[in-house]
Amino acid sequence: MKNVKLLLAGMAITMAACSPQKQAEEPTLKDVFKDKFLIGTAMNTWQVAGLDTAAQNVVKKHFSAIVAENCMKAEEIHPEKDRYNFAAADSLVAFGEANGITVTGHTLIWHSQCPRWFWFDENGELVSPEVLKEHMREHIHTVVGRYKGRI
């Protein structure tokens, strides 16, 4: 009985001393599909700024493309007729470039998340089709011009 206990103790020590083999790391989503298509996700300003580091790390590891969740929508990037706010959009593009992630464009103007001035004049009346087309042209040219070749 004493020999069995010694044998078991020796086996336990031997097994404890053996380190487990390093398991093979699972391939990332972007690596699995790299020869077929980009794997993308939307990013919000908190993630881009590094305030949600867990999400940012998942994006860096698994995704080959990003798109702005909201920071490039007209309401955010062009809040007033003569004022643009590119800070958050610039950060998103810089994050993609710094991490080798393709930045994908999104709808520049749509029915939702567009500033009120885009559709209505200072009297609260709908702008004319001509004025609306000019707002659209100016907005599109400004945003596309700023990020040309980067998105």
Residue ranges: model-predicted function:
Residues 1-29:
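Bacterial Sec-dependent N-terminal signal peptides
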Residues 3, 38, 102:
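Residues at the starts of beta-strands that form the adenosine-phosphate
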Residues 13, 43-44, 99:
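Short alpha-helical scaffold segments that flank and stabilize functional sites
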Residues 23-55, 59-65, 69:
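Boundary/entry segment of secreted carbohydrate-active catalytic domains
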Residues 24-27, 84, 127:
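Short coil/turn linker and secondary-structure boundary residues
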Residues 43-53, 74-87:
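Acidic-and-aromatic substrate-binding clefts and catalytic sites of carbohydrate-active enzymes
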Residues 65-79, 88-151:
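Substrate-binding cleft and catalytic face of glycoside hydrolase catalytic domains
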